[in-house]
Amino acid sequence: KETAAAKFERQHMDSSTSSASSSNYCNQMMKSRDMTKDRCKPVNTFVHZSLABVZAVCSZKBVACKBGZTBCYZSYSTMSITBCRZTGSSKYPBCAYKTTZAZKHIIVACZGBPYVPVHFBASV
């Protein structure tokens, strides 16, 4: 079974590019990373930084998560991210996404030993 940490990497890490390559980025990535298998995942964020830099956020600024849990951390520095948001015309299995690039602080939830990101909470 896929671990929570591995799922985070699959759904949110794209260290191989510094930003979204094209307006088609989300359509390609959401499909290739298995987020359109059973349904269209409505919203997802990819982070274009090294895994080490994203894992380091787990020891950065302690903040509350959206759901009120306290295991979230905000990055001290901004990171290159791409937001993928389902378009109005998107219909499973033909999932369609709008690609938006940004430089923002990320907020992740961390757990385990080693203490690593398991959930992408928000970007600010």
UniProtKB/Swiss-Prot annotation:
A GO molecular-function annotation: lyase activity
One of its Pfam families is RnaseA
InterPro entries, alphabetized = RNaseA, RNaseA-like_dom_sf, RNaseA_AS, RNaseA_domain
Q: Which reaction does it catalyse?
A: an [RNA] containing cytidine + H2O = an [RNA]-3'-cytidine-3'-phosphate + a 5'-hydroxy-ribonucleotide-3'-[RNA]; an [RNA] containing uridine + H2O = an [RNA]-3'-uridine-3'-phosphate + a 5'-hydroxy-ribonucleotide-3'-[RNA]
Catalytic residues identified in the record: 12, 119
Location relative to the cell? Secreted
Instruction: List residues binding substrate.
Output: 7, 10, 41-45, 66, 85
| Main localization, broad class | secreted
User: Which cysteine pairs are covalently linked by disulfides here?
Assistant: 26-84, 40-95, 58-110, 65-72
Found, by tissue, as follows: Pancreas.
Q: Disordered: where is this region?
A: 1-25
EC annotation from Swiss-Prot or TrEMBL: 4.6.1.18
Query: What is a biological process (GO) this protein takes part in?
Result: defense response to Gram-positive bacterium
Gene3D superfamilies assigned to the protein according to its UniProt record, in alphabetical order = Ribonuclease A-like domain
Spell out the Basic and acidic residues composition-biased ranges.
Answer: 1-13
A GO-annotated cellular component = extracellular region
Keywords, A to Z? Disulfide bond, Endonuclease, Hydrolase, Lyase, Nuclease, Secreted
The entry's function note states: Endonuclease that catalyzes the cleavage of RNA on the 3' side of pyrimidine nucleotides. Acts on single-stranded and double-stranded RNA.
Assembly mode: Monomer. Interacts with and forms tight 1:1 complexes with RNH1. Dimerization of two such complexes may occur. Interaction with RNH1 inhibits this protein.
Family in the record: Belongs to the pancreatic ribonuclease family.
Q: What is this protein called?
A: Ribonuclease pancreatic
Name of the encoding gene: RNASE1
